């Protein structure tokens, strides 16, 4: 739900419920939302835009996704992939797509360049919930000739048990996006530590193709890896390849299918097939006169 409240203040509110059934351990169907059988508020925030001269300033306050890298829900949900990237999944020693902030952010920029600074307290959902404490996120973004490149940094409390997870969770990341003629590429690379004495590096690159010749089909492919280095058996070196499609059957109904080949992921086989159907309902309120 979104709209304008008063005097140029915009609001966004989102609630979700998801459930995963079965005894097999999997990271399927967690692209942008938790599947823990609880109804919860994901985002609830207000924005105010200011335009001093050629610049643009956006002030945001409330509960919102941690603005690190490619972090929007629409960047990952219902886009053709049924699993989050490895560096964006709960419990894979990186930065989950379910990390959120209770706080405020200020974004300031001119055409083709912006800087965003955020301060808040963790408000995470899902399995990887950070411990309470002030955290900060800084992101810069530049665009040139159809390419958008961003650099991000985050410092926060870890989400693992304080019995062994000392220090802070700190990551730096690089992301890029490009689109032309129905072909889009995007990807992220991340490096840092989930807590002291460990190191996580990894990234992914996504290809999306939606050309007139494909009709209702959007083809997708992903290549990714994640390396978690620690001096115990929990070290993880994972690789995953995904090929699939999003098929629009009706204006409100679509199918998504993924074929997966992977290695190095605990408790998961080398191959998988994911299939999902999405039905959309939309309600538009009449404009006030």
Task: Please identify what each model-predicted range represents.
Residues 41-44, 100-104, 113, 134-138, ...:
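Hydrophobic, lipid-facing positions within transmembrane beta-strands of outer-membrane proteins
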Residues 1-122, 132-134, 140-149, 206-212, ...:
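Outer membrane beta-barrel
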């Amino acid at each position: 739900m979104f709209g304008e409240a008063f005097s140029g203040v915009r609001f966004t509110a989102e609630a979700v419920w998801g459930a995963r059934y079965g005894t097999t351990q999997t990271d399927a169907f967690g692209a942008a939302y938790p599947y823990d059988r609880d109804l919860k508020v994901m985002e609830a925030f207000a924005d105010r835009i200011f335009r001093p001269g050629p610049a643009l300033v956006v002030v945001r306050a409330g509960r919102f996704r941690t603005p690190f890298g490619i972090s929007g829900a629409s960047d990952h949900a219902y886009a053709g992939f049924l699993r989050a990237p490895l560096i964006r999944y709960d419990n894979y020693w990186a930065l989950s797509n379910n990390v959120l902030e209770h706080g405020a952010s200020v974004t300031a920029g001119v055409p083709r360049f912006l800087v965003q600074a955020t301060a808040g307290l963790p408000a995470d959902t899902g399995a990887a919930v950070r411990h309470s404490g002030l955290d900060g996120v800084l992101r810069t973004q530049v665009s040139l000739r159809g390419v958008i490149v961003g650099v991000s940094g985050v410092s926060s409390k870890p989400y693992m048990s304080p019995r062994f997870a000392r220090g802070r969770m700190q990551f730096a990341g690089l992301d890029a996006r490009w689109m032309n003629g129905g072909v889009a590429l995007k990807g992220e690379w991340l490096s840092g530590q989930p807590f002291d004495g460990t190191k996580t590096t990894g990234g992914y690159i996504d290809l999306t193709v939606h050309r007139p010749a494909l009709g209702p089909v959007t083809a997708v492919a992903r290549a990714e890896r994640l390396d978690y280095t620690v001096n115990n058996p929990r070290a993880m070196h994972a690789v995953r390849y995904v090929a699939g499609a999003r098929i629009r059957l009706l204006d409100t109904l679509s199918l998504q299918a993924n074929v997966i080949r992977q290695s190095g992921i605990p408790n998961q086989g080398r191959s998988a097939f994911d299939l999902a159907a999405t039905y959309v309902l939309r309600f538009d309120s009449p404009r006030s006169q």
